[in-house]
């Protein structure tokens, strides 16, 4: 009997622990999906850069903010170099999270490299570059698009400057690569977006009235947010607008409002920006030729100076005679 009781207790404990683990996994999965905004672009767009040159992240992150990129002016074939993306913002500001509370901003970036350029393999990255990268994890936009890299969301407090380790192609082994000047495109955002890919609004944007009329009732919902009832005097209908937790309400009961008038403030403090740079894939033979030319010019100058000094000495001797 005692053994039976012990067995039942063990089964109950095991079931309780299993349920707890499943709940935690579900929460973590939902959180990661909610925060992983590069996934939205990957799922909705085959290419992150439209034919117009606009990067698709701007479709969800409506506010325009600056972004910077630094790359070498030129690189040699089969060489690892740094592409530094800077996403500046005020570290003191807080954003509205999905649950309506305030929190720190995350950042993310997409780097569109020329064909043939790709993320450097771990064994090719120099220790000093690894130190700058930290714990960042980069991934390809598509498995077959190694030249398009994405990162994020990552904590903006720590990673407002992101170092991408890039490996340049070698035209000797990659026939698609050539010794030319190439463009590089980058997009960087800080904070959450205002619109989801399906067109629905997030709680990180302004909410407007859907009808003209008098605000007859405002109900604060138990989990946050508001239910706003608008009486339309023209046809006597009632319209109900819902505001999720996060934005601050600007209207009050009894107030007359017009259609499309702002019901809330705009809580967004982030934004998206894009920039481009150029890089030259330099031919080593051309570099060697340039060095030889410069060396010959220097030697010629030295010989001219020596010849001039010799000529001056001869003139001086002739004058003494």
UniProtKB/Swiss-Prot annotation:
Pfam families: Apocytochr_F_C, Apocytochr_F_N. PROSITE patterns: CYTF. Its cofactor is heme. It is a single-pass membrane protein. GO terms for biological process: photosynthesis. GO terms for molecular function: electron transfer activity; heme binding; iron ion binding. It comes from the Eukaryota. SUPFAM superfamilies: Cytochrome f subunit of the cytochrome b6f complex, transmembrane anchor (SSF103431), Cytochrome f, large domain (SSF49441), Rudiment single hybrid motif (SSF51246). InterPro entries: Cyt-f_TM, Cyt_f, Cyt_f_lg_dom, Cyt_f_lg_dom_sf, Rudment_hybrid_motif. The chain crosses the membrane at residues 287-307. Keywords: Chloroplast, Electron transport, Heme, Iron, Membrane, Metal-binding, Photosynthesis, Plastid, Signal, Thylakoid, Transmembrane, Transmembrane helix, Transport. It is found in: Plastid, Chloroplast thylakoid membrane. Binds 1 heme group covalently. Residues 1-35 form the signal peptide. Heme binds at residues 37, 57, 60-61. GO terms for cellular component: chloroplast thylakoid membrane. HAMAP family: Cytb6_f_cytF. Belongs to the cytochrome f family. Component of the cytochrome b6-f complex, which mediates electron transfer between photosystem II (PSII) and photosystem I (PSI), cyclic electron flow around PSI, and state transitions. The 4 large subunits of the cytochrome b6-f complex are cytochrome b6, subunit IV (17 kDa polypeptide, petD), cytochrome f and the Rieske protein, while the 4 small subunits are PetG, PetL, PetM and PetN. The complex functions as a dimer. This is Cytochrome f. It comes from Cryptomeria japonica (Japanese cedar). The lineage of its organism: Eukaryota, Viridiplantae, Streptophyta, Embryophyta, Tracheophyta. The gene is petA.
